[in-house]
């Protein structure tokens, strides 16, 4: 490593942004091929390229931060700002779905029967699986906070236990959501109700899967003693993201499942 007189991380040339862009092209093109020609070859290639890119890019970042010492306090401060801006962008992303839902539900058109839910739609009971899902995510918020406090106190065993419980609850939530989709009496093609319901809850479910993956990586890293009480931004970012997913679900539950039904 060349000598430098500043605390900033000058990133070395990397192929992963290019392969990541290629995987995005393959996945979007693959989705179009799947929808129109029932061919999943391009989509599978895109997913494989994306998984390989994620693994190798994360490997490089872990090497730079944990073993090479590139992530100084100034670099970590910049990463924190970046994560905050990313979460803010996600807030606006989900705001669009809530806007679409309330635009359609507060003033139902004659085509919908002048009522909400639209005529012929039988919404899910908010006091059954959706309420259980809410309890699961709230419990996962408690366990991730426990894991964070345990890490700050240097209690590795409790940190791993809290993280494992959070991951298990995240997987359980995903399975419950999948069963709910399977048993729903309406589909994404059933007008504006079906489209707003499945797009909003579906993207939230995708974020739960992403967050669970994020936490699994943190769990595997902690098994290798990568985190300390003073150097653990990877885990902190995962915890922020998970709390954001929790809050979005509360808004989804109150708006779409409870009020919208």
From Swiss-Prot:
Gene3D superfamilies: 1.10.287.70, Cytochrome c oxidase, subunit III, four-helix bundle (1.20.120.80). One of its GO terms (biological process) is respiratory chain complex IV assembly. The keyword Mitochondrion applies. Signal peptide: none annotated. It is a multi-pass membrane protein. It holds the Pfam family COX3. It comes from the Eukaryota. Its EC number is 7.1.1.9. Keywords: Membrane, Mitochondrion, Mitochondrion inner membrane, Translocase, Transmembrane, Transmembrane helix. It is found in: Mitochondrion inner membrane. Residues 35-40, 106-128, 184-190, 257-261 are mitochondrial intermembrane. GO terms for cellular component: mitochondrial inner membrane; mitochondrion; respiratory chain complex IV. It catalyses: 4 Fe(II)-[cytochrome c] + O2 + 8 H(+)(in) = 4 Fe(III)-[cytochrome c] + 2 H2O + 4 H(+)(out). The chain crosses the membrane at residues 16-34, 41-66, 73-105, 129-152, 156-183, 191-223, 233-256. Component of the cytochrome c oxidase, the last enzyme in the mitochondrial electron transport chain which drives oxidative phosphorylation. The respiratory chain contains 3 multisubunit complexes succinate dehydrogenase (complex II, CII), ubiquinol-cytochrome c oxidoreductase (cytochrome b-c1 complex, complex III, CIII) and cytochrome c oxidase (complex IV, CIV), that cooperate to transfer electrons derived from NADH and succinate to molecular oxygen, creating an electrochemical gradient over the inner membrane that drives transmembrane transport and the ATP synthase. PANTHER family: CYTOCHROME C OXIDASE SUBUNIT 3, CYTOCHROME C OXIDASE SUBUNIT III. Belongs to the cytochrome c oxidase subunit 3 family. Component of the cytochrome c oxidase (complex IV, CIV), a multisubunit enzyme composed of 14 subunits. The complex is composed of a catalytic core of 3 subunits MT-CO1, MT-CO2 and MT-CO3, encoded in the mitochondrial DNA, and 11 supernumerary subunits COX4I, COX5A, COX5B, COX6A, COX6B, COX6C, COX7A, COX7B, COX7C, COX8 and NDUFA4, which are encoded in the nuclear genome. This is Cytochrome c oxidase subunit 3. It comes from Equus caballus (Horse). The lineage of its organism: Eukaryota, Metazoa, Chordata, Craniata, Vertebrata.
